[in-house]
Structures are given as structure tokens and as C-alpha cells.
Regions:
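Gly/Pro/Ser/Thr-rich low-complexity, intrinsically disordered segments predominantly at protein N-termini
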Residues: 1-196
Length: 196
């Protein structure tokens, strides 16, 4: 998804109440980070295909476990390093029981303890996702895996928390295998149906 600050909002900070009011009335997903509101706009065909493939693979692998997979409509809440609340919409979220779901606005439950999140990158969102959102995701105590999937080439950057430290690994090529929450997924299955 594209991370765009609307030109009218670039230099304006919003209160959490302002954000929640706008979110309640919005027909698109809005993220709230450090007082700024980001509109999450339409996705490319490749983005949609990759996200669908990820959802299908993890649904199959997690079926019958205490973990679940949610699409990009699952909002994740986190307190940033300054103690401010932030609310984002990962492209894919994996959560294990017990889920910490809280009603933050009138229409949605917000997940505060995801185990893993995935972001499908595009030229318009990769800086925002790999810098701003990565730093937020790394603050979530329950988070073990943060995955960035390129849609313009076969490449995945996988951040894993091991003994309190975050380590990254890059996977490239259709034969590579990535493991998240004990689910081994071959990149060929993630990129199935995507042409470059």
C-alpha cells in the first residue's frame, strides 16, 4: 500500500481523538504515527497476489494451532519510544493466543500483541515501512518476526528477534525458504502468479 500524507496534512499534527474521528468516517485505512495521519491507498496487482499467497500459505500452516492469520484490515496498536500511541495496518498479521484485542474506536478491534507482521513493499512505501514501521514493530514485546517482501523482484528481508536482539536476513531466489512461527515457506509459493 502507498503511504501518503495528504498535502493538506503534511505539516499538521493530529491528536489521537482527531485520528479516531477521521478513521471512523473514512472509507480507506488510515495509519497514525507520531501525530501524523497516513492514508493507505490502493495496491498493485503484484501486491495483492503476494499478499493473497502469504495469507493462503500461513492459513494452511497455522490451521489447528493457537495462531491465526489476518489480512490488511487488522489494525495493530503500539506505544512508540515516546509513549505515544501509534496505529498501523500491516499487510498481513500473525497472532497467537491469547490475543490482546482492544476496542479503540467504534468500528474496529485493535491487536496489541502480534507475533509476526508482513509488509509488501513498493517504491512509494518502502522507506516508510522499513524505517518508521520497522522501528514501531520492534517495540512490541510479543513480536518475533517482521518481514518485508519486495514486489518488483524476488527478495525478502526477514527480521527475527533472538534473545532480545533483532537480526535481519535477506532471502532471494525462488528456491529459498523462510521460516516464521515454525512455518517453512518457499519463496516460489510467495511469488506464485507474479510476473516481473
Amino acid at each position: 500500500m502507498s503511504a501518503l500524507r495528504n498535502a493538506d496534512h503534511v505539516h499538521r499534527r493530529y491528536s489521537l481523538d482527531d485520528y479516531l474521528d477521521l478513521l471512523e468516517r473514512s472509507t480507506i485505512r488510515l495509519e497514525y504515527v507520531a501525530g501524523y495521519i497516513y492514508a493507505m491507498t490502493g495496491a498493485s496487482r503484484e501486491h495483492i497476489q503476494i499478499n493473497s499467497n502469504l495469507h493462503g500459505e500461513f492459513y494452511i500452516h497455522l490451521k489447528g494451532t493457537n495462531c491465526s492469520v489476518s489480512s490488511n484490515d487488522m489494525q495493530v496498536g503500539v506505544q512508540d519510544e515516546n509513549g505515544e500511541e501509534a496505529y498501523v495496518f500491516p499487510d498481513l498479521t500473525l497472532a497467537c493466543q491469547p490475543e490482546d484485542l482492544r476496542r479503540v474506536n467504534k468500528r474496529d478491534d485493535v491487536l496489541f500483541n502480534p507475533s509476526a507482521v508482513f509488509e509488501v513493499l513498493s517504491s512509494s512505501n518502502e522507506d516508510y515501512d522499513q524505517k518508521t514501521k520497522l522501528s514501531l514493530y520492534q517495540l512490541i514485546p510479543s513480536m518475533t518476526d517482521i518481514v518485508f517482501v519486495r514486489q518488483d523482484s524476488i527478495e525478502i528481508v526477514h527480521w527475527t528477534r533472538l534473545t532480545g536482539e533483532w537480526l535481519s536476513r535477506t532471502y532471494a531466489g525462488l528456491d529459498a525458504t523462510m521460516t516464521v512461527l515454525d512455518c517453512a515457506i518457499i519463496l516460489q509459493d510467495i511469488y506464485r502468479g507474479v510476473t516481473f
